[in-house]
Amino acid sequence: MKDNLERAKLMVSSTVFSWLLLCLFAVTTSVSVQPTCTFPAIYNFGDSNSDTGGISAAFEPIRDPYGQGFFHRPTGRDSDGRLTIDFIAERLGLPYLSAYLNSLGSNFRHGANFATGGSTIRRQNETIFQYGISPFSLDMQIAQFDQFKARSALLFTQIKSRYDREKLPRQEEFAKALYTFDIGQNDLSVGFRTMSVDQLKATIPDIVNHLASAVRNIYQQGGRTFWVHNTGPFGCLPVNMFYMGTPAPGYLDKSGCVKAQNEMAMEFNRKLKETVINLRKELTQAAITYVDVYTAKYEMMSNPKKLGFANPLKVCCGYHEKYDHIWCGNKGKVNNTEIYGGSCPNPVMAVSWDGVHYTEAANKHVADRTLNGLLTDPPVPITRACYRQ
């Protein structure tokens, strides 16, 4: 009797184990048979973290030594080389994005970049000449996209030159394109300058709702795949330390970053993720990926040596000593001696390029940590981001 009972238990256990293996095989097979997403184009919206020449085309061109590493010349990027959006294009086998505002040498066959340095999600009552805030807020970038989409359709039917038509997007490919967002940091920076902490925190839901409206706009025009970056730990930007003096106890965290600013960034990210989850329910045909660049960037602050970096708070380009500050690419006098704010000898070891923006090496780390799905929700690589989870 006892032996029969034991045999029965073994049979049940074996059946359950076999069933679990079958389910695992079915899930694995289901995932493996999904073909890699083929994105014909990328349309990007953002700020200087992903601007490939927009603000430089609209205002004063970015000068040397920006771009010295990879491109060997300034290209309108706030870095010594490539940005995360460039690594996204590489991963998808697409050319680097031309800035929408760049009128010369642009090719929009495989997408366009509407991002500009200093952009915010919400419109700000400031000018770029005051605090560096771009006039091209997210709603303006979406309006530019609307116009771009409509005008490119018209031009495609009017232009007779095959060479010129090859620089225009195909209308049927807008629905298959990848739409990327990397914006929000400047909204928080402006808030810290103009509001109390409580006032700024109270504006976060509205800021995030403006971003959600942008996603809805593109969805209504046929866009289906969205790759949404959260905001980085802007309390770790070395510029925060330039004029700080001796910080009060508890002002900085263990990595030397401004705690209050990073806490606000995390609050923004919490609300953004919540909004992305709700958008998935609302936009039933959309595949929306939330991308945690905050963690990828903070890793470089907390474990720089492990990742191959030197002091992450040390600025690579520019001259910053005590009370003397000469920004990257500029000249100034220190003790009656002219100083050029040039590049450090080994940017690949640096995290911060100019005190505000990241080096190519840092941007590559962010790309490596996010494009494979390790820091995304849902946890899918960008090459499978077109599938709704």
From Swiss-Prot:
Record: glycosylation sites: 125, 335
GO BP of this protein: lipid catabolic process
GO CC field: extracellular region; plant-type cell wall; plasmodesma
Enzyme class name: hydrolase
UniProt GO MF annotations: hydrolase activity, acting on ester bonds
Signal peptide: 1-30
InterPro entries referenced in this protein's UniProt entry, alphabetically: GDSL, SGNH_hydro_sf, SGNH_plant_lipase-like
Name listed for the protein in its UniProt record: GDSL esterase/lipase At5g14450
Predominant cellular place of this UniProt entry's protein: secreted
Active-site feature positions: 48 (nucleophile), 354, 357
Localization terms from the record: Secreted
Keywords: Glycoprotein, Hydrolase, Lipid degradation, Lipid metabolism, Secreted, Signal
Native organism taxonomy: Eukaryota, Viridiplantae, Streptophyta, Embryophyta, Tracheophyta
Family, similarity comment: Belongs to the 'GDSL' lipolytic enzyme family.
Domain of life: Eukaryota
EC number: 3.1.1.-
